């Protein structure tokens, strides 16, 4: 089964290639913090030889509480992303929540992301696809892996096959998510690159009454389990002070653990991809 390769600048993304990191912070809390976080990611990924794309949101439109911090908004967010790209020479990925945002975001960002909660919204999917940007499609918590084929088809019929699928866990009762490792293989059958969002798979949605809880202590276990499935990449959020992060701090890796964390994952990825495939059907 031939696997597609998606190109973002000089980066090649594919399930059989060395893993790519989509990493950064949950939301653009400030310009200075974004620069600090990106600088550390760049230092570590350059040292380890991991292809890297900076990630952050300019607007968190699906917060639990109306009083929760959402971000700087579209205009200011794009200015920060432009500065990050110019300063660190890295591609950028961010999420789009409404059709009108797709084109202006795609003009700045190298990859635009379809949020899990919105992944069946046809108008949004089509607007994003028509930009011809690379699209990272988050699998909704309520969708089976095989149902992602319908979203891929919407994008393809809108003229875009520069697509990535991303697992982020499935609802398991109330306030909990689980990751079905068999789902990765199902999505890989569509031949597009598959990523694993380990950060949001650790969420406990609504677990803190007015915000999501999380299980940061298990991030290494879950990341290793995911990359053992021979994936194109990992989606990760980190923060220098998770206890005071403005969104999803309980899920965020401590920034000072980034190098040790990624070093182990790179070794695992290299080992897994050195094994020949075994036909067991």
From Swiss-Prot:
Family recorded in the similarity comment: Belongs to the KdsA family.
InterPro entries named among the record's database cross-references: Aldolase_TIM (IPR013785), DAHP1/KDSA (IPR006218), KDO8P_synthase (IPR006269)
UniProt GO molecular function: 3-deoxy-8-phosphooctulonate synthase activity
This enzyme's EC code(s): 2.5.1.55
Main EC class the enzyme belongs to: transferase
Catalytic reaction list: D-arabinose 5-phosphate + phosphoenolpyruvate + H2O = 3-deoxy-alpha-D-manno-2-octulosonate-8-phosphate + phosphate
Official protein name in the record: 2-dehydro-3-deoxyphosphooctonate aldolase
Subcellular location: Cytoplasm
Pathway(s) the chain acts in: Carbohydrate biosynthesis; 3-deoxy-D-manno-octulosonate biosynthesis; 3-deoxy-D-manno-octulosonate from D-ribulose 5-phosphate: step 2/3; Bacterial outer membrane biogenesis; lipopolysaccharide biosynthesis
Organism: Pseudomonas aeruginosa (strain ATCC 15692 / DSM 22644 / CIP 104116 / JCM 14847 / LMG 12228 / 1C / PRS 101 / PAO1)
UniProt KW keywords: Cytoplasm, Lipopolysaccharide biosynthesis, Transferase
One GO-annotated biological process of the protein: Kdo2-lipid A biosynthetic process
GO cellular component terms, A-Z: cytosol; Gram-negative-bacterium-type cell wall; membrane
């Amino acid at each position: 089964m031939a696997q597609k390769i998606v190109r973002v600048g000089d980066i090649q993304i594919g399930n059989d290639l060395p893993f790519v990191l989509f990493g950064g912070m949950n939301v653009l809390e400030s310009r200075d913090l974004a620069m600090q976080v990106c600088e550390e990611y760049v230092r570590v990924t350059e040292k380890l030889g991991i292809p890297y794309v900076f990630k952050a949101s300019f607007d968190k439109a699906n917060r639990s509480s109306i009083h929760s911090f959402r971000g700087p908004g579209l205009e200011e967010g794009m200015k920060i992303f432009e500065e990050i790209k110019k300063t660190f020479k890295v591609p950028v990925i961010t999420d789009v929540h409404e059709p009108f945002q797709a084109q202006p975001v795609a003009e700045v960002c190298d990859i635009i992301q379809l949020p899990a909660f919105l992944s069946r919204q046809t108008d949004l999917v089509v607007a994003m696809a028509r930009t011809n940007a690379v699209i990272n499609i988050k699998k909704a918590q309520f969708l089976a892996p095989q149902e992602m084929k319908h979203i891929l088809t919407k994008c393809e019929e809108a003229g875009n096959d520069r697509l990535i699928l991303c697992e982020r866990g499935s609802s398991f009762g109330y306030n909990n998510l689980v990751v079905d490792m068999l789902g990765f293989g199902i999505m890989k059958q569509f031949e597009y690159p598959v990523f694993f969002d380990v950060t949001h798979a650790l969420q406990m949605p609504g677990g803190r009454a007015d915000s999501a809880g999380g299980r940061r202590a298990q991030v290494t276990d879950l990341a290793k389990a995911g990359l053992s499935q021979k994936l194109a990449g990992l989606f990760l959020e980190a923060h220098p002070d998770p206890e005071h992060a403005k969104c999803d701090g309980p899920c965020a890796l401590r920034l000072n653990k980034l190098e040790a964390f990624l070093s182990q994952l790179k070794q695992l990825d290299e080992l897994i991809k050195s094994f020949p495939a075994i036909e067991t059907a």
